[in-house]
Amino acid sequence: MATYKVKVATGTDFFSGTLDSISLTIVGTQGESHKQRLNHFGRDFATGAVDDYTVQCQQDLGELIIIRLHKEPHSFLPKDPWYCNYVQICAPNCRVYHFPAYQWMDGYETLSLREATGKTTADDTLPILLEHRQEEIRAKKDFYHWRVFVPGLPNYVDIPSYHPPPRRCRNPNRPEWNGYIPGFPILINIKATRFLNLNLRFSFVKTASFFYRLGPMALAFKLRGLVDRKRSWKRLKDIKNIFPATKTVVSEYVAEHWTEDSFFGYQYLNGINPGHIRRCMQIPDKFPVTDEMVAPFLGEGTCLQAELEKGNIYLADYRILDGIPTVELNGQKQHHCAPICLLHFGPDGNMMPIAIQLSQTPGPDCPIFLPNDSEWDWLLAKTWVRYAEFYSHEAVAHLLESHLIGEAFCLALLRNLPMCHPLYKLLIPHTRYNVQINSIGRALLLNKGGLSARAMSLGLEGFAQVMVRGLSELTYKSLCIPNDFVERGVQDLPGYYFRDDSLAVWYAMERYVTEIITYYYPNDAAVEGDPELQCWVQEIFKECLLERESSGFPTCLRTVPELIEYVTMVMYTCSARHAAVNTGQLEYTSWMPNFPSSMRNPPMQSKGLTTLQTFMDTLPDVKTTCIVLLVLWTLCREPDDRRPLGHFPDIHFVEEAPRRSMEAFRQNLNQISHNIRQRNKCLNLPYYYLDPVLIENSISI
């Protein structure tokens, strides 16, 4: 008779426990136990509980390799979902086996779990283990399907549970709820989130903090009448009163300094879209700036050509926005442009705008605006650039390059790598809640009647078109941060704190990934010979990059260094890249003139005509402003249930070497955090968006 001591850990989130009957079968190399119900006097499997049980077997089962958890009805009680963290079994020889689960069992089902040691296909020799990993992948591919979101954009997750059950209503003539929440100014497609699978949903705590924060704020806007006013703002200072209780050092700085050229240029380096600017070695033909135009702003003893040769001239080109039609908002036609902005990095360390053209096509009706133009001409020209920044940031840098790309990485991981695979264990913490927040994003932003349709000058179709163009230009090198800085020519630009911090985090990730990868992949042949890894990479190329070869994304990985770079890129994209463009959104956008989502007058075609009144009449109206800020406030306010970068409470790795690597990674991140905070003490405007304690492991908000 062999005795096995079993520990079963239930999740800590509300309603993780179950009243259903749970049984266990243990499979070893020398036999299999009978199915035994796990039950003792009192409540079993309560939320947060770690329950102890004893399983008796007729013989020693040898090395334990698989367990099966059977969830069945208990008496007359209704079905009750259960979240299992893990199962630990102490064998008669005192060896402890760990079986990670970290998933919901919703219905009456059997869940097979492997022992936690990370293994590639080449490491498995037992037929039962090979069959188990194949069956796991087959089951996940049957459940998780790709779905076209918008042609030309990364595909996303289409799950059978997305579709609501047949409508049951006593009155068949009763109209179906249209999706509006009373008092909320935009349509929310609740169906896109309501039927999401439990394993992809927010925790109860996160859901409650997210939605219960949204409702009261929307109601407050309604009671104050802000979402019903379709007129211009009367005074700029009134915009400060939208969020009177959410002021920060940065948001106050933005409101006070937004008109200054130095702050305008600073945002290209350390704002919320710091990856757009690039060094200019030659003025493009479509932007006919002359030395006579900009000489007064370059300093004495130099000229435009000299500054170009020194590498002090930078360009922000918004050609991706060219030619996209606009829509009407609140009964008024909106306007649009694709500006070009030339900047100069001076000896005083300031990045200063020196010329702005509000079109991609030069001509007599498209003047080049300069800092010595009238105050309101120059300010409105800069505001048009900030308007273009809104779309460059929200559509490309934020939604496309972090959320949608990250979701594709996540789905490809779930479909192609079994739980025992080392890369699954390494990357699964960086996929947490990604699908849920993207479902909310589509429900809030990218549906008919949503934010893009009701508060953006480009509307839903135009906003999607910007993302499609963004994906058509996206490259693998641009997602690998060190390569991106070199390609844009900003690798040695002083005062670029985003670059300094992102490289520090990237290299810390790279060291961590290197230690994990080299532990499981001793040579290049192990990488090239891993079919599950290769299928994961191929599916990302197919479903995320849509098989576009010009993207430079690999279709296979052949060497250990290639795998290290690829995995680091995925990890960085799903964590730090998102933090850099998301965390500061409200601080930089709460002062609406710094980040307008729409413009109500056309771009200026001549100089000297802009006044304060025309400036105010060009900015978004009160309703549009408040709709945008309400949604951004909701999406930027981090709810509870955070997991900072490097915090891995779920035990996926059990080997000593990976555990040491995880601890070393945390120590490196702590040092980076300390360095950032020490630097910020000396700055008038701190940059902390890539402080590891503020970076989430995953895209979860």
UniProtKB/Swiss-Prot annotation:
Function noted in UniProt: Catalyzes the regio and stereo-specific incorporation of a single molecule of dioxygen into free and esterified polyunsaturated fatty acids generating lipid hydroperoxides that can be further reduced to the corresponding hydroxy species. In the skin, acts upstream of ALOXE3 on the lineolate moiety of esterified omega-hydroxyacyl-sphingosine (EOS) ceramides to produce an epoxy-ketone derivative, a crucial step in the conjugation of omega-hydroxyceramide to membrane proteins.
Ranges of residues in domain PLAT: 2-119
Description of activity control: Increased by calcium.
The record's free-text note on cofactor binding: Binds 1 Fe cation per subunit.
A molecular function GO annotation: oxidoreductase activity, acting on single donors with incorporation of molecular oxygen, incorporation of two atoms of oxygen
Top class in the EC scheme: oxidoreductase
Pathway(s) per entry: Lipid metabolism; hydroperoxy eicosatetraenoic acid biosynthesis; Lipid metabolism; sphingolipid metabolism
Protein name, as recorded: Arachidonate 12-lipoxygenase, 12R-type
Reaction it catalyzes: (5Z,8Z,11Z,14Z)-eicosatetraenoate + O2 = (12R)-hydroperoxy-(5Z,8Z,10E,14Z)-eicosatetraenoate; N-[omega-(9Z,12Z)-octadecadienoyloxy]acyl-beta-D-glucosyl-(1<->1)-octadecasphing-4E-enine + O2 = N-[omega-(9R)-hydroperoxy-(10E,12Z)-octadecadienoyloxy]acyl-beta-D-glucosyl-(1<->1)-octadecasphing-4E-enine; a N-[omega-(9Z,12Z)-octadecadienoyloxy]-acylsphin-4E-enine + O2 = a N-[omega-(9R)-hydroperoxy-(10E,12Z)-octadecadienoyloxy]-acylsphin-4E-enine; (6Z,9Z,12Z)-octadecatrienoate + O2 = 10-hydroperoxy-(6Z,8E,12Z)-octadecatrienoate
Chief place where the protein resides: cytoplasm
Organism: Rattus norvegicus (Rat)
Residues binding Fe cation, per UniProt: H398, H403, H578, N582, I701
Localisation per UniProt entry: Cytoplasm; Cytoplasm, Perinuclear region
One cellular component term from this protein's GO annotations in UniProt: perinuclear region of cytoplasm
EC code: 1.13.11.-
Alphabetized SUPFAM superfamilies for the sequence: Lipase/lipooxygenase domain (PLAT/LH2 domain), Lipoxigenase
Entry similarity comment: Belongs to the lipoxygenase family.
